[in-house]
Amino acid sequence: MRKLILAALLAGTGLAGHAQPAADYPARPIKFVLISAAGSGGDTLARLLAEKMGPLLKGNFVIENRPGGGGSIAVDATAKAPPDGYTITLGGATTHVLLPASRPSLPYNAVKDFAYIGQVGTASIVLLASNDLPANNLTELLALANASPEGLQYASWGNGSTGHFCGALIQLKKQAKTTHIPYKSVAQIQTDLLGGHIKLGWVDMVSGTPMVKSGRVKAIATCPERSPSLPGVNSIQDEGIDLGGRSMGSWGLYAPAGTPKPIVDKLAAALRSTLDMPEVKARMMELGTQAAFIPGDEYSVMTAKDIEYWKQIAKDANIRNE
């Protein structure tokens, strides 16, 4: 009898232990692992979310920048962290759709290894050109590339990145004579563009918009859609490149798989409330990102479908990211 009573007490304690973390959460700072370097577009967006979500959660965040591998280093570290709600990451199309579609050896499963907190928003990227390149839009660029014996080279922030896929789509759909050059970061692309070492490079809107508006470079096209940051610049879809209704420009929040649902729900509620704030919407618009919350369960299903679509594009465009 005493053993039965003890077992019941232990079971009760266990149940209380599962219920208590959500009520007390967060009891310590939450580690926010970022896929990009300090000062980048993703870093700026993450710090904005942390600033606004912290008070809603009655807690705070500790930022940890872990750039590299197209974002896979930070995302993999999050997937392998304890599923207790104290490690999250800001990823999206590159880390959870395009890398899984092009890298068979990716160390994480983009769907199964994460608890999806929710979509943060959608964003485009921009193809920048040096001012001395004799092309001002995608039509002129394609004519220039195809008239050159060697074609043209363009940079992106890594094999399998959004920039790589956007460039590959142009090459595939428009039979463009172009060659991809993988860089380690957007910052390096900016430096080499301004230094005259390369003529073309894809960057995020946060990084690219000031460069265009200051006249230091010009914008050739955005991908996948027009951006509110540069509304006068055509998107690749404006130029007749169909994406089949699939996403390739989203940001999302993720925790490790197995994170208790009450904690995920608490994070999701804070995220949703943050994205409803007018000042957050306005600041995100300045960053070239449109706030657009989608619940984690729905976002996960969308991601799984998008991966399959982009796998075929990767195969057709011969994108392999080992």
Give, region by region, the residue ranges found by the protein language model.
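Short, low-complexity disordered leader/linker segments with a strong preference
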Residues: 1-27, 139, 322
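N-terminal (or domain-start) structured segment
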Residues: 19-113, 151, 159, 174-200, ...
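An extracytoplasmic/periplasmic, membrane-proximal ligand-sensing/linker region
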Residues: 27-29, 172, 213, 238, ...
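Stable alpha-helical elements in mature extracytoplasmic
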Residues: 41-45, 49, 53, 74, ...
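Hinge/capping helix and adjacent helix->loop/strand transition within the periplasmic-binding protein
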Residues: 53, 77-86, 101-188, 236-241, ...
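A ligand-binding cleft/hinge motif common to bilobed small-molecule-binding domains
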Residues: 94-105, 169-173, 200-234, 311
